[in-house]
């Protein structure tokens, strides 16, 4: 997917224009819920259909699997990721689309066990909140597997 960078003072206020009517899953961390950013975004656009805020630092497959099962039946067309590198990486994991909604398919794609051409990606709008690895512009995600 090509990357387009948009920046500017108060650019978040234009988020509805970028969502463009698509059913959106918002992925963030609990801190942004507590600070009121999620409520602000919901006021800016009516297209947020669900919020995932339990992304931990250094996301692990086992944690993402639990969240995957929570969202697998949500019919979203876009992911809005607001947070640091861990949130952006988790969003890339959830963007791997498969018709059967099977977790193992997604894990195998991420681990490189299946050809990357066999799937499509759900688009992501990333709003990075930290200066870090540049996760918002790369196709890679760091997902930890402490069991292997």
Give the positions of each predicted feature.
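A glycine/threonine-rich phosphate-anchoring loop and its flanking beta-alpha core
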Residues: 100-148
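Hydrophobic/aromatic beta-strand patches that form the interior of the parallel beta-sheet core
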Residues: 50, 80, 123-127
């Amino acid at each position: 997917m090509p990357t387009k960078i948009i920046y500017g003072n108060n650019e978040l206020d234009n988020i509805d224009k970028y969502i463009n009517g698509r059913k959106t899953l918002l992925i963030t961390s609990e801190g942004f819920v507590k600070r009121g950013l999620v409520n602000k975004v919901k006021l800016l656009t009516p297209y947020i259909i669900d919020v995932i805020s339990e992304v931990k630092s250094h996301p692990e497959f086992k944690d993402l699997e639990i969240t995957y099962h929570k969202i697998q039946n949500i019919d979203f067309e876009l992911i809005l990721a607001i947070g640091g590198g861990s949130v952006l990486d988790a969003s890339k994991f959830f963007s791997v689309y498969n018709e059967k909604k099977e977790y193992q398919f997604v894990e195998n794609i991420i681990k490189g066990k299946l050809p990357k051409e066999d799937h499509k990606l759900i688009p992501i709008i990333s709003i990075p909140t930290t200066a870090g690895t540049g996760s918002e512009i790369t196709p890679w995600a760091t997902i930890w597997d402490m069991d292997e």
